């Protein structure tokens, strides 16, 4: 009993978070699991420090992205969270762990470890030293065989405790306002609550669709598919594959046709345009493009823009002064797109991946509509050179009837953060 009291009052869980890919989305999941592990151990959690992401070169910290006070407040009845390690543990730094074997560092957490693993292997460290650092920590907590309370806590962290910092929400709300009331225009308000309030009062809000599109060079090259850009593009992508992965791209063993019919080729902006048109969207649809950088630039999205002239993005809707605080910061740019995606009437993503999974799950949790394109069907239809437009449209509509937000239950081994039902839902 004494040991436990000691643990709950003094222990710290210090987590290393080396980020990769779209940074803040990976972090979502790590921080949720960190809270769960702290709960299992009755330990205090120290807000993690982020390392600069080598790919995105983004030095944004947890506190630059998320509203930390909100985070701590929402979880105050669940666990104790502190922003910094207390003075007596100041020696417990990233450098300290990087430069030698340390008794307070736990390196052996297996992938998808059980709750028992933590009480057997980390609790003794906490009891002896008052602090433990678990690194690496990605995917180190199982999704199955966890108590209901722990699952609920993970849901609470992911869907309620993590809120973006006020300036991201303010910018996001301005974008949403301008999409809903295109004629009025509005200044970015630093008081996001006020702006949200005004939004609710105004009448005749227009609807908008968010299209999440990831079609960057990295992805195009890695898919090993062809994208109709002719010989020059084929050579450019082949060269990129050679330089970046020394040719080791798993998909290379398949032909373009095989990959396409399996739905393994990213959809091009043009293909997505045809999909949207087949589903009944038209030139009166207000479309927001949530996208980082499109390989091929404006030329590649020309067809999409022709079909949907009311297409907007972060850049078209804001001035450069308004974007100054997020300029060049991949995680903040992604956060703004995430925020707008969460508030759209319809969300459609043509790019499976972290952002896709996170937004789809969050929208499921909030019961908002999402369209999930069938990549395999699209691949097959685009290969068919004799298909007419009415046939294409018919096939698309038929296949997408039950891909418009119907809840899919999590299966064993799947992530709670991708499939929040049933664990995060009421009466589960
Ligand atoms: C944590 O606290 C709870 C409630 O006080 C207790 O039931 C549980 O055994 C504790 N767990 C550990 C690992 O100390
Ligand atoms: C939208 O499409 C309709 C029907 O194809 C056409 O008549 C109309 O001119 C278009 N409007 C704009 C603004 O392009
Ligand atoms: C192409 O589509 C047409 C019309 O649906 C169909 O009859 C034909 O079999 C398809 N061809 C291939 C190669 O799948």
List where the protein language model places each region.
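A donor-sugar binding/catalytic signature common to diverse glycosyltransferases
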Residues: 32, 52, 332-377
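Catalytic donor nucleotide-activated moiety binding site of glycosyltransferases and closely related
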Residues: 243-258, 283-326
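Short, solvent-exposed loop/turn segments at secondary-structure junctions
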Residues: 51-54, 215-218, 292-296, 318, ...
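Amphipathic alpha-helical interaction motifs in eukaryotic regulatory proteins
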Residues: 32-42, 273-277, 288, 305, ...
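Leloir-type glycosyltransferase catalytic cores
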Residues: 374-428
């Amino acid at each position: 009993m004494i040991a436990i009291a000691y643990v709950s009052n003094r222990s710290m869980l210090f987590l290393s978070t080396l980020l990769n890919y779209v940074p803040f989305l990976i972090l979502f999941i790590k921080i949720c699991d960190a809270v769960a592990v702290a709960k299992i151990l009755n330990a205090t959690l120290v807000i993690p420090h982020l390392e600069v992401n080598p790919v995105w070169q983004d030095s944004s910290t947890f506190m630059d992205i998320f509203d930390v006070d909100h985070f701590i407040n929402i979880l105050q009845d669940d666990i104790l969270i502190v922003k910094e390690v207390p003075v007596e543990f100041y020696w417990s730094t990233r450098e300290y762990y990087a430069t030698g074997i340390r008794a307070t560092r736990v390196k052996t957490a297996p992938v998808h470890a059980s709750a028992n693993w933590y009480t057997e292997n980390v609790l003794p460290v906490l009891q002896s030293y008052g602090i433990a650092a678990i690194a690496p920590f990605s995917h180190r907590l199982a999704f199955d065989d966890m108590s209901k309370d722990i699952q609920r806590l993970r849901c609470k962290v992911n869907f309620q405790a993590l809120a973006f910092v006020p300036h991201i929400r303010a910018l996001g709300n301005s974008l949403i306002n301008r999409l809903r009331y295109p004629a009025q225009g509005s200044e970015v308000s630093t008081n996001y609550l006020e702006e949200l309030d005004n939004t609710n009062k105004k009448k005749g809000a227009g609807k908008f669709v968010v299209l999440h599109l990831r079609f960057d060079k990295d992805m195009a090259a890695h898919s090993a598919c062809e994208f109709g850009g002719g010989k020059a593009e084929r050579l450019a992508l082949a060269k990129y594959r050679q330089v970046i992965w020394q040719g080791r791209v798993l998909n290379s063993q398949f032909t373009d046709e095989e990959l396409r019919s399996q739905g393994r080729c990213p959809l091009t902006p043009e293909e997505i345009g045809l999909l949207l048109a087949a589903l009944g969207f038209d030139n009166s649809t207000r479309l927001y493009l949530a996208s980082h950088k499109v390989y091929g630039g404006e030329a590649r999205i020309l067809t999409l823009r022709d079909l949907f002239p009311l297409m907007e993005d972060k850049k078209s809707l804001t001035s450069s002064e308004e974007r100054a605080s997020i300029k060049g910061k991949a995680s903040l740019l992604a956060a703004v797109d995430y925020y707008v995606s969460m508030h759209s009437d319809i969300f459609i993503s043509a790019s499976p991946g972290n952002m896709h999974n996170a937004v789809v799950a969050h929208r499921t949790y909030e019961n908002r509509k999402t369209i999930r394109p069938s990549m395999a069907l699209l691949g097959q239809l685009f290969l068919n050179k004799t298909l007419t437009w009415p046939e294409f449209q018919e096939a698309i509509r038929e296949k997408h009837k039950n891909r418009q937000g119907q809840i899919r239950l999590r299966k064993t081994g799947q992530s709670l953060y991708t499939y929040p039902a049933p664990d995060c839902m009421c009466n589960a």
